[in-house]
């Protein structure tokens, strides 16, 4: 407990924050500002360049030479919109365009750059220069954690508060800026509530020799033994221990920014505390945007949650080639672990609709949480501590090399197995260990020279284009983790990007959105990303979209033929129809799967075969065939069969003579297939 006064000097130095912002932006975009910092930002160009460096293509198009005020404001709006949607910043963390363009409320610009810098630190992909958050110390209210956007605030030596947030914790009265108050951590007491308190401040008023001898120790930080002139925070359990604001957080090891807590001798920063209740997040947390919540608070919010490990605060400082220890929340004593048997043990979503194909603990979780709740090695449920590495979690006893079964340590250099995705130790993943490698293509051991592509070993003659099987001796292009020669990759991009001429009906089966997080590729059962082919209710990665016939397995880059809701190439489709049809031409004995059919004297013919054969004039037997369209009985000798359906001559669609097979274009059946819906539309024009 300390007796304190309000100060007239803000704990936040705006000039220092703006100087750090300018230096950070120049280091990120590798370009110096030509003039005054604020004036250089007015056209929005530097801001758009900044966010594109942090999150590539966040602002794909902006005016790089704006000549009008409207164009400049539009660039600023593009930056604000991208910071909100791409980086997860909230409206309260963003400045308005007039704040920058009219040079008002400059403090709000610093607030936005501060939160953008924090979001960049949390990004898993951004590896560039980082913003020094210490230069923004005291920017937010230490009580409500919200930004102070005006001059209506009160400050202490190390903290500042909205005037409305500076209230007595006992009587809830607003603290008078002209009077002294009493403070302990984030709690304040007015003088009236502290009247009559026993020995309050007695140690400060006493002049005993003992207190005098300990004066030097009382003025030093218990953590770094530095000076406490700029303020301190007392330990909640040991009032004699004091910690300065320069100490680092004991959980994330980042410098302490603004307010922090001390519990059980551990210093915890705001980022390692629950956004709602302030509780330490050392046992794990739930993340929502860039805010973090403890388990009870996250459950009360009833929003989609994802369990993160306790070190998730600064994963950007970690070496991602090394595993990290995490603590799961699937312990049976946890409130969230006591679920119904038909609900996911992590998010309460029903798992009834999920295919129970594993027969182990993975069936206890919904598809998005299978990896979070189960071991990547034994598929057993994770209880207590676990090791998180390569997008998987492992029991400590299961964290072994996938090849030699050697126990792995957290400091070991490991590599991801290209087949199972599990970790490999250094010797097993080394390129020098030739005898332990098999060619990824032919599966035979590699004893001589080898080449490596996409983290997989090949014989020199086995590295071929995934599409045309051309031997790849020079550069190649990766598409969905498969090698393609440059011509095939260019052709693939033409079909999927819309550069290829498309028919009027139908369209490409490749889509870039529209699936759920629980949807998986039906071939590799991996999460969907990038361009995906949708056939009826099934999804395929672009590299997995091949003919269903295993003996063929041809990539379906230029079209497909559906059978039983599965895609086939043209050759395999014809084979299927030939094997299923019951009608064979009486002359050539070949199956009749398309074109015009003649039925004479109980026999069926291809029209071309019947026309080329001389027949005696005889009356034909009555036909028992019904038209598929009008349902009437076909009385003549000639009818048309398309896609194993019979039509009278009046209702028959035109047979197609085209043999081109592209997505949605006319097939040799005389119809158009919409790959997204599977709807078939007969072509009426030749």
UniProtKB/Swiss-Prot annotation:
SUPFAM superfamilies in the cross-refs: Calponin-homology domain, CH-domain, Glucocorticoid receptor-like (DNA-binding domain)
Ranges annotated as biased composition (Basic and acidic residues): 305-314
Record InterPro entries: CH_dom, CH_dom_sf, SM22_calponin, Znf_LIM
Protein keywords: LIM domain, Metal-binding, Phagocytosis, Repeat, Zinc
Disulfide bonds: none
Span of domain LIM zinc-binding: 139-200, 219-279, 373-435, 437-495, 519-579, 583-658
Protein known as: Calponin homology and LIM domain-containing protein
Classification of source organism: Eukaryota, Amoebozoa, Evosea, Eumycetozoa, Dictyostelia
Region of interest: Disordered: 305-345
Chain ranges of the Calponin-homology (CH) domain: 15-120
Compositionally biased residues, Low complexity: 322-333
Subunit structure: Interacts with limF and rab21.
Organism annotation: Dictyostelium discoideum (Social amoeba)
GO cellular component, one term: cytosol
GO molecular function: metal ion binding
Role of this protein: Involved in the regulation of phagocytosis. May repress rab21.
Pfam families: CH (PF00307), LIM (PF00412)
Gene Ontology terms describing biological process: filopodium assembly; negative regulation of phagocytosis; phagocytosis
Induction: Repressed by limF.
């Amino acid at each position: 407990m300390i007796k304190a006064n309000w100060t007239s000097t803000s704990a936040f130095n705006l000039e220092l924050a703006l100087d750090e912002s300018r230096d950070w932006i120049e280091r990120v975009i590798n370009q110096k500002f030509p003039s005054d910092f604020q004036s250089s930002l007015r056209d929005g160009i530097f801001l758009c360049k900044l966010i594109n460096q942090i999150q590539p293509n966040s602002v794909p198009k902006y005016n790089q030479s704006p000549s009008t005020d409207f164009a400049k404001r539009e660039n600023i709006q593009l930056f604000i919109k991208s910071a909100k949607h791409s980086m997860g910043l909230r409206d309260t963390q963003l400045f308005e365009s007039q704040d920058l363009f009219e040079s008002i409320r400059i403090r709000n610009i610093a607030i936005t750059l501060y939160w953008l810098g924090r979001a960049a630190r949390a990004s898993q992909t951004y590896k560039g220069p980082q913003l020094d958050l210490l230069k923004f110390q005291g920017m937010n209210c230490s009580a409500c954690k919200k930004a102070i956007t005006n001059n209506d605030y009160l400050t202490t030596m190390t903290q500042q508060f909205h005037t409305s947030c500076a209230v007595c914790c006992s009587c809830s009265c607003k603290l008078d800026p002209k009077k002294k108050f009493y403070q302990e951590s984030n709690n304040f007491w007015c003088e009236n509530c502290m009247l009559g308190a026993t020995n309050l401040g007695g140690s400060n008023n006493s002049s005993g020799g003992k207190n005098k001898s300990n004066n030097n120790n009382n003025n030093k930080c218990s953590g770094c033994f530095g000076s406490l002139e700029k303020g301190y925070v007392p330990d909640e359990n040991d009032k004699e221990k004091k910690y300065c604001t320069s100490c680092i957080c004991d959980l994330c090891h980042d410098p302490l920014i603004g307010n922090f807590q001390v519990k059980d001798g551990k210093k915890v920063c705001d980022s390692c505390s629950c956004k709602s209740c302030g509780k330490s997040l050392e046992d794990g947390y739930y993340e929502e945007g860039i805010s973090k919540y403890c388990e009870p608070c996250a459950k009360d919010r009833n929003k989609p949650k994802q369990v993160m490990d306790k070190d998730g605060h600064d994963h950007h400082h970690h070496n991602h080639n090394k595993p990290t220890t995490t603590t799961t929340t699937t312990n049976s004593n946890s409130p969230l672990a006591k679920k119904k048997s038909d609900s996911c043990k992590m998010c309460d979503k029903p798992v009834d609709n999920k295919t129970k194909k594993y027969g182990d603990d993975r069936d206890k979780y919904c598809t998005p949480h299978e990896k979070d709740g189960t071991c990547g090695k034994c598929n057993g449920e994770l209880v207590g501590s676990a090791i998180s590495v390569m997008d998987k979690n492992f029991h400590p006893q299961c964290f072994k090399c996938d090849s030699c079964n050697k126990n792995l340590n957290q400091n070991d250099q490991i590599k991801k197995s290209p087949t199972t995705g599990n970790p490999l130790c250094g010797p097993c993943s080394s390129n020098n260990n030739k005898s332990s490698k098999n060619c990824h293509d032919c599966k035979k051991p590699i004893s001589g020279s080898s080449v490596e592509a996409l983290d997989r070993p090949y014989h020199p003659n086995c590295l071929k284009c995934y599409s045309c099987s051309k031997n790849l001796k020079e550069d190649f292009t990766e598409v969905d983790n498969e090698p393609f020669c440059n011509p095939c990759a260019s052709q693939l991009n033409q079909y999927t990007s819309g550069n290829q001429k498309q028919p009027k009906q139908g369209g490409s089966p490749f889509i870039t959105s529209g699936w759920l997080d629980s949807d998986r590729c039906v071939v590799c059962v991996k999460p969907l990303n990038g361009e995906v082919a949708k056939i009826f209710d099934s999804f395929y990665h672009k590299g997995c979209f091949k003919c269903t016939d295993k003996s063929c397995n041809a990539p379906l880059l230029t079209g497909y033929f559906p059978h039983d809701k599965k895609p086939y190439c043209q050759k395999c489709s014809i084979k299927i129809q030939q094997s299923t049809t019951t009608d064979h031409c009486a002359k050539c004995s070949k199956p009749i799967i398309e074109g015009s059919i003649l039925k004479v004297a109980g026999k069926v013919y291809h029209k071309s075969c019947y026309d080329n054969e001389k027949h005696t004039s005889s009356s034909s037997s009555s036909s028992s065939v019904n038209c598929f369209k009008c349902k009437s009985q076909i009385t003549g000798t000639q009818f048309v069969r398309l896609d194993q359906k019979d039509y009278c001559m009046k209702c028959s669609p035109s047979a197609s003579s085209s043999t081109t097979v592209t997505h949605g274009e006319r097939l040799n059946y005389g119809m158009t297939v919409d790959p997204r819906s599977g709807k078939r539309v007969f072509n009426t024009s030749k």
